[in-house]
């Protein structure tokens, strides 16, 4: 096991210190420039569409898709998970406070990237036997014609199934088990079994039950955690300026706040900031497009605009509050790690109730992520093997949830980083190849062109020669 850990660590070092660090940020910067800072220009619209969707009762999810808000809720369910609590704490310990700054940077540019992901997922989604499916595998196949496209799409699907359904959900159950062991002294394995049974119940309900669960859990859990964190930060308001000083100084001159050698520590801050940021907001990873593909919208860019808000909520609100809780309460050097670190921060104000509060928040955060990631993995199972393999996949995921609750946390996180990174490579390559399609789609959207109309629940193609590149609608498997 030690050898496996070392090999995985070496590969992760190469991926996250060099390749993915520049590829993720570079792609985000490229789309930010090419789409003319779409994350800034369309922020107000995204805010309105997102929070307007909470107030309005949308369509019920079924085989023909979800409402725009249900799609976002399913995506945010995956985004807002252990990355916001345990992941933020891990980044702080491994990369110092400066890692939070690099999380912000990657998230800002990542908003442009995820706009492109959601737009392409909508454009290239398929309809088969009355069921809509979509995600990176479908647009990767379009980006690279012939066997190359099929091979890359298949690789992405394999990486996604392993990264989300297996190693990713092991991280979630591991964090739930850790939180409940700290709060109540319960054996993590017992917690894992209970979570697995509850998750299995949701899995068998299909997309309808998944959408129903996420649209109810996500707004409530996010609001409760935000309010609790704001109380902690408000109580320690005198430490807020120093917390931000540590974040900004730690990003460029960590020795000024007690860091190690400048070059190495800055590199670590960037590495763990980007890596944990990706694990948290998933921009560029290719996971959330599976949910955004199912949104019932008139134009693909409508969902692209909504998708950006998922990154904003995840990183700039929830993750930032977690970091401020840790930094303002002074528990950074307590020796705690993982979810135990924000638990220690809450304990300074709320006592044992704070420990229990984080355990409950972690349960809902991680459980919703398990549900969301299962759905993403299921989509890729169907892409590779069809519906016949879904039941086997569901049973395997349930087993890995139980297994993850009892494993050593370091190895679980390392495996998750590895397969998350492997997902990124084919996804970003396809995004770059199809960047012209994304830009033309945005141009038509801003020009007020409606490229999809719903007819009896089935979206029909409607395009002309001038806008053929941005024609959208479901395709059949035979196309």
Can you say where each PLM-predicted feature lies in the sequence?
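Transmembrane helix-loop junctions in multi-pass membrane proteins
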Residues: 3-4, 34-39, 83-88, 164-176, ...
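Flexible loop linkers connecting adjacent transmembrane helices
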Residues: 37-66, 90-100, 112-147, 332-349, ...
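Membrane-interface loop-to-helix entry segments
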Residues: 23-30, 34-47, 156, 173-180, ...
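Helix-loop-helix module between adjacent transmembrane segments
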Residues: 31-32, 106-130, 137, 141-174, ...
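Selective recognition of specific alpha-helical transmembrane segments in multi-pass small-molecule
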Residues: 109-117, 193-207, 218-238, 271, ...
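Extracellular/periplasmic helix-exit of transmembrane alpha-helices
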Residues: 115-123, 129, 230-246, 254-261, ...
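N-terminal alpha-helical transmembrane segments of multi-pass membrane transport
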Residues: 1-78, 82, 93-98, 110, ...
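Alpha-helical membrane segments and immediately flanking helix-loop junctions
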Residues: 56-93, 120-123, 129-137, 141-143, ...
């Amino acid at each position: 096991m030690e050898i496996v850990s070392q090999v995985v660590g070496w590969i992760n070092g190469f991926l996250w210190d060099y390749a993915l660090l520049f590829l993720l940020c570079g792609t985000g910067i490229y789309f930010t420039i090419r789409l003319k800072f779409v994350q800034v220009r369309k922020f107000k619209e995204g805010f309105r569409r997102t929070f307007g969707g909470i107030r309005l009762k949308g369509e019920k999810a079924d085989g023909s898709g979800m409402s725009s808000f249900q799609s976002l809720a399913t995506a945010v369910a995956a985004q807002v998970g252990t990355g916001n609590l345990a992941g933020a704490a891990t980044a702080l310990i491994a990369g110092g406070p400066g890692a939070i700054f690099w999380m912000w940077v990657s998230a800002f540019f990542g908003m442009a990237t995820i706009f492109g992901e959601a737009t392409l997922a909508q454009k290239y989604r398929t309809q088969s036997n009355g069921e809509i499916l979509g995600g990176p595998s479908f647009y990767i196949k379009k980006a690279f014609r012939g066997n190359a496209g099929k091979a890359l799409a298949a690789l992405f699907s394999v990486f996604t199934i392993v990264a989300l359904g297996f190693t990713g959900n092991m991280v979630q159950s591991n964090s739930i088990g850790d939180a409940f062991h700290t709060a109540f002294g319960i054996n993590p394995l017992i917690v894992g079994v209970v979570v697995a049974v509850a998750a299995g119940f949701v899995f068998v309900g299909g997309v309808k039950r998944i959408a129903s669960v996420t649209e109810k859990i996500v707004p409530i859990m996010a609001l409760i955690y935000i309010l609790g964190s704001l109380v902690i930060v408000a109580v320690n308001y005198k430490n807020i300026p120093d917390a931000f000083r540590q974040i900004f100084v730690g990003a460029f001159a960590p020795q000024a706040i007690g860091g190690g050698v400048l070059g190495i520590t800055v590199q670590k801050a960037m590495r763990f900031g980007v890596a944990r940021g990706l694990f948290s907001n998933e921009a560029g990873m290719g996971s959330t497009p599976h949910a955004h593909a199912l949104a019932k919208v008139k134009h693909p860019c409508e969902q692209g605009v909504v998708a950006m808000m998922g990154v904003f909520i995840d990183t700039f609100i929830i993750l930032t509050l977690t970091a401020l809780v840790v930094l303002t309460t002074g528990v950074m050097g307590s020796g705690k790690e993982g979810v135990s670190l924000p638990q220690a921060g809450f304990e300074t104000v709320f006592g044992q109730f704070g420990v229990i509060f984080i355990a409950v928040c972690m349960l809902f955060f991680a459980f919703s992520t398990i549900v969301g990631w299962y759905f993403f993995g299921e989509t890729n199972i169907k892409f590779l093997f069809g519906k016949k393999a879904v039941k086997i996949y569901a049973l395997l995921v349930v087993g890995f949830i139980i297994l993850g609750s009892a494993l050593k946390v370091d190895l679980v996180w390392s495996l998750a980083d590895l397969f998350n990174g492997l997902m990124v490579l084919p996804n970003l390559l396809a995004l770059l190849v199809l960047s012209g399609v994304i830009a033309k789609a945005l141009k038509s959207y801003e020009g007020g062109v409606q490229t999809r109309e719903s007819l009896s629940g089935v979206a029909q193609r409607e395009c002309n020669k001038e806008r053929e590149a941005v024609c959208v609608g479901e395709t059949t498997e035979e196309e």
